[in-house]
Design a protein with these regions (language model features):
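ATP/NTP phosphate-donor binding region
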Residues: 1-55, 95-112, 123-129
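Short glycine/serine/threonine-rich phosphate/pyrophosphate-binding segments
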Residues: 64-68
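Active-site catalytic pocket residues across diverse enzymes, especially alpha/beta-hydrolases
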Residues: 72
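Proline-centered loop/turn at the N-terminus of a beta-strand
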Residues: 76-78
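Divalent-cation-assisted or electrostatically stabilized phosphate/pyrophosphate-binding catalytic cores
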Residues: 83
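Catalytic core of DAGKc-family lipid kinases
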Residues: 87-164
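Conserved mixed alpha/beta catalytic, RNA-binding, or beta-rich assembly cores of soluble enzyme
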Residues: 167-168
Length: 168
């Protein structure tokens, strides 16, 4: 891979010290990088991923990776999470191992790209959400118990009477 898209959680890398270190390492390998353009809420601006980018490096925790996946929905861009958080279940690469990971991505022996299953949650006719890890359905307002009809691929899986349901 020759070109990387860098997505940084600025709450985890406030002064961009880690981002700079990773970008400098990419340059040392003779490769290119582009820093993600974000709006004031921290979402990646649609249509700003350069066409020559081959991989996104997400610097943050699992939440940062999930947000990047949602923001980049529809892009054919593999993402690799570099964990700057406390728990890196989805952000698989620990910061101390970033050079090894980049070496693998840039080398002759490319790292394998895994396709991950994603869930799409639809509530009623209007609310739609993309999930990488789980979907949480909860009640609104003062309603005590709600009936949840859970469908999978259009087939009723089960009906639950509950305060909420977590689908993972």
């Amino acid at each position: 891979m020759d070109s990387f898209y860098i997505i940084t959680n600025i709450l985890k890398d406030k002064d961009y010290a880690v981002t700079d270190k990773i970008c400098n390492y990419i340059e040392q390998k003779g490769k290119k990088w582009t820093l993600a353009k974000k709006d004031e809420e921290g979402h990646i601006l649609p249509g700003t991923v350069p066409s020559d980018v081959e991989c996104g490096l997400v610097l943050g925790g699992d939440g940062t990776l999930i947000r990047a996946i949602r923001d980049l929905e529809g892009e054919e861009l593999p993402l690799l999470g570099i964990n700057l958080g406390t728990l890196g279940y989805l952000a698989e690469v620990e910061l101390k191992d970033y050079q090894y990971a980049i070496d693998r991505l840039c080398g002759e022996e490319h790292a394998a790209i895994e396709l991950r299953m994603m869930l799409e949650g639809v509530a009623g006719d209007e609310k739609r959400d993309l999930a990488v890890n789980d979907i949480v359905l909860t009640r609104e307002g003062n309603i005590r118990i709600v009936q949840f009809n859970v469908y999978v691929n259009g087939t009723l899986l089960n009906t639950y009477l509950a305060d909420g349901v977590i689908i993972s």
